[in-house]
Amino acid sequence: MTDNPLLSSASQIEDQDAALRPKTLAEFVGQAGAKDNLQVFIESAKQRREAMDHVLFFGPPGLGKTTLAQIIARELGVNFRATSGPVIAKAGDLAALLTNLEHGDVLFIDEIHRLNPVVEEVLYPAMEDRALDLIIGEGPSARSVRIDLPPFTLIGATTRQGLLQTPLRDRFGIPVRLQFYSVEELERVVARGASLMGIGIDKGGATEIARRSRGTPRVAGRLLRRVRDFAQVAGAEKITQSIADNALTRLEVDKIGLDLQDRRYLTMIADIYKGGPVGVETLAAGLSEPRDTIEEVIEPYLIQLGMIARTARGRCLNDRGWQHLGLAPPSGQMPGLFGPDE
């Protein structure tokens, strides 16, 4: 055993992701407006002794959708059941989940936009009427059977709200958009994570990690662990700004959080397509990445920074994108032509 405060015992290392998750709304950092509203809805449901209305969390990945769903179940004092859209292949799979719920339980479906349309049809009466309509048998002998369900709360999570069918989206009484975090909020996330992991960190170190975390708590937690590795091997007693800067530079994460893949994306538009427009399928092929990765992982933060624009003709590099690459737009392109308002 070592006295180095950066070292953790085996029990501390085990399941660090779960250990770092906040357990209550009071512990949850950021999303102040959404959090305050959820507190009201939870208290109202508890006072009425009813199941809370169905909730839809939407926004970029890594902002706390799953964590908030777990917190809702915990604060309601009910069971938490979790699954994901692609896993529920058949209507029977969903029926098995729903019929095993107890009064007030929370059923969490991640990537709910990827539900099979046939499964969605079964979900509609379950959400609205607390009932399950099933067809038993085939052909002339087939008959419809309605099974009553206990009151429950469905919580859906999606990074692609626009892909949800309107009838499904409209059945969620509590839609909640999650926003990217500010640097100050991420500093608190990093400081809290370091404390829970038994890592010493000063304000400069927390700020450096926060600035490069893409506005996303999940990224902040991942970078914190990697910086801890560098600090530990260097024999440092705590993470400072210089240690964090050195570690993140070696990990090829730049000053505003862009990684190698982000820079490849920007460089491809700038060098090969002269700033765009260029189609997303072309970019996906050039980067050897699926379209979903481009649209859900790479682009949201670049759009948030004002570096690219999604237009009807394709992706275009904005002035800030050119500036970040240290390049000037082609002479034929007017400054600001593809600005954020396009």
Swiss-Prot record:
Protein family membership: Belongs to the RuvB family.
GO biological process: DNA recombination; DNA repair
Natural source organism: Novosphingobium aromaticivorans (strain ATCC 700278 / DSM 12444 / CCUG 56034 / CIP 105152 / NBRC 16084 / F199)
Organism taxonomic ancestry: Bacteria, Pseudomonadati, Pseudomonadota, Alphaproteobacteria, Sphingomonadales
Pfam annotation, one family: AAA_lid_4
Catalytic activity: ATP + H2O = ADP + phosphate + H(+)
MF terms in GO: ATP binding; ATP hydrolysis activity; four-way junction DNA binding; four-way junction helicase activity
Top EC class of this enzyme: hydrolase
Region (Head domain (RuvB-H)): 255-342
Binding site for Mg(2+): T66
Any one GO cellular component localisation term in the record: Holliday junction resolvase complex
InterPro entries: AAA+_ATPase (IPR003593), AAA_lid_4 (IPR041445), DNA_helicase_Holl-junc_RuvB (IPR004605), P-loop_NTPase (IPR027417), RuvB-like_N (IPR008824), RuvB_C (IPR008823), WH-like_DNA-bd_sf (IPR036388), WH_DNA-bd_sf (IPR036390)
EC number: 3.6.4.-
Known role: The RuvA-RuvB-RuvC complex processes Holliday junction (HJ) DNA during genetic recombination and DNA repair, while the RuvA-RuvB complex plays an important role in the rescue of blocked DNA replication forks via replication fork reversal (RFR). RuvA specifically binds to HJ cruciform DNA, conferring on it an open structure. The RuvB hexamer acts as an ATP-dependent pump, pulling dsDNA into and through the RuvAB complex. RuvB forms 2 homohexamers on either side of HJ DNA bound by 1 or 2 RuvA tetramers; 4 subunits per hexamer contact DNA at a time.
Region of interest called Large ATPase domain (RuvB-L), as start-end residue ranges on this chain: 2-181
Keywords: ATP-binding, Cytoplasm, DNA damage, DNA recombination, DNA repair, DNA-binding, Hydrolase, Nucleotide-binding
Free-text domain note: Has 3 domains, the large (RuvB-L) and small ATPase (RuvB-S) domains and the C-terminal head (RuvB-H) domain. The head domain binds DNA, while the ATPase domains jointly bind ATP, ADP or are empty depending on the state of the subunit in the translocation cycle. During a single DNA translocation step the structure of each domain remains the same, but their relative positions change.
Residues annotated for DNA binding in this entry: R291, R310, R315
Subunit structure: Homohexamer. Forms an RuvA(8)-RuvB(12)-Holliday junction (HJ) complex. HJ DNA is sandwiched between 2 RuvA tetramers; dsDNA enters through RuvA and exits via RuvB. An RuvB hexamer assembles on each DNA strand where it exits the tetramer. Each RuvB hexamer is contacted by two RuvA subunits (via domain III) on 2 adjacent RuvB subunits; this complex drives branch migration. In the full resolvosome a probable DNA-RuvA(4)-RuvB(12)-RuvC(2) complex forms which resolves the HJ.
Name of the protein: Holliday junction branch migration complex subunit RuvB
Compartments it resides in: Cytoplasm
Tagged with keyword Lyase: no
Binding site for ATP: L20, R21, G62, K65, T66, T67, R171, Y181, R218
